[in-house]
Amino acid sequence: MISTAIQQLVNYGLDTGLILPDDEIYIRNQLLMTMQLDSFTEPEGDVCYADLESILKTLVDDAVARGVCDDSPTARDLFDTRLMGVLTPRPSIVRANFEERYETDGPQAATDWFYKFSQDTDYIRRYRIKRDVKWVTKTPYGDLDITINLSKPEKDPKAIAAAKLAPQSAYPKCQLCVENEGYAGRLNHPARENHRIIPLTINDSAWNFQYSPYVYYNEHCIVFNSQHTPMKIERATFRKLLDFVSLFPHYFVGSNADLPIVGGSILSHDHFQGGHYEFAMAKAPIEKKWVFPGFEDVDAGIVHWPMSCIRLTCADDERLVELADQILTAWRGYTDESCFVYAETDGEPHNTITPIARMRDGKFQLDLVLRNNLTTPEHPLGVYHPHAKLHHIKKENIGLIEVMGLAVLPSRLKQELFDLADLLVARAPTAGYPEALQKHAEWAQDILDRHPELNADNVHLILQDEVGHVFAEVLADAGVYKMDTAGRAGFVRFLESVK
């Protein structure tokens, strides 16, 4: 009976604290309105429920059956988000709760509460996050995190076709804009009725804090400008990053680079990503200490990491801003033909930085990863980008998350690796692989040559390990200065140029 499912959702709201007992009748009636129902039958006895996913499925199935909701993945997501929006407190209440916890119990208590809240509202769909495939691969650079992302919805063909016919809207301007809070969504823009953001002030400017709905790592948060303004790495960027870790010292925060190929997927809206997690790069040691003239108070050095990373540590955050700005300015204009580093070609700039900030033992720390987006006929997608032989695993941009040591791999790989495992165990000739697996054929033969012990019991672990090592190669390709004698000598030449 649909009344039971409605009461289950009301009880879920009460159990999670999203609503209070005084809200019960009001919320029930709002849910009835959303479902386009005008009556309710009180269920007999206690109303129990298994989980939120099953409650929402029951309600959406009923709405679909009555023609209230279209039967497509996109339409279903829009509708169940509308239901959860009924349970979600208004922004003013959420912000007051966050601020009270921050002032009374500290920043970690505030973020702990907000992270749970963002899951309870189903903005972060816990039941989908669980589907992601994750493992760790040991490499010479440390333990790399590998994930095949299954929680981010695939593009729905029906929705894509319908979106092309729908009137085009420029509101909100993008998925990061503040105007998303409470937005009902449409076929080509996700619903955000259950989405709440926390305003922040960093570098005396208006920014905001929210969580990523896809949670690639623990407490994966997004910090974004209140204005729809493009990504830009500049002196103010370092100030903003350090201001954020001052507010939330248990979090790291970083920015994607501001140029195509080496930047993230959204260059149009200035934003950072952070969270409560320590990546392999953060754990990587300094392989060569360095002293920048005039900054003897700053501990600096080259990090033992396949991407070219300079680490700066100091108790005085303003000193880090000053030195980071000098390094950025030097790198923007730096050319070293012997290392195939060109600041610009035909007026197009190539050099930028991916910066990451954190607190370490009571001091401020900045990691500055040197990036270059030069392309050539041999490497049309980027010289410092995964090369073609690795595209069967990772072809997409190497953004902030990958830079730090977490591979976010496409969902297609789950089935491809499963199918490939069967072929490897059978020692099937690679020439006969189906079309979808042909891109893996050369890699598969190499795996067989190196793993004569491969069998049905160990094939999946071997494949996971091999994918992890491919990701290590991806990072090496994306590194400007290679981890060899010539590369490290080139890195030192750049450090010497910073004045």
Where are these regions (language model features)?
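Active-site microenvironments that recognize anionic phosphate/pyrophosphate groups
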Residues: M1-V223, Q227-P230, P306, L320-A324, ...
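Catalytic or ion-translocation cores adjacent to nucleophile or general acid/base/metal-coordination motifs
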Residues: A236, V245-S268, G274-T335
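Helical scaffold of the NTase/Pol beta-like nucleotidyltransferase catalytic core
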Residues: N194-I198, S226-V253
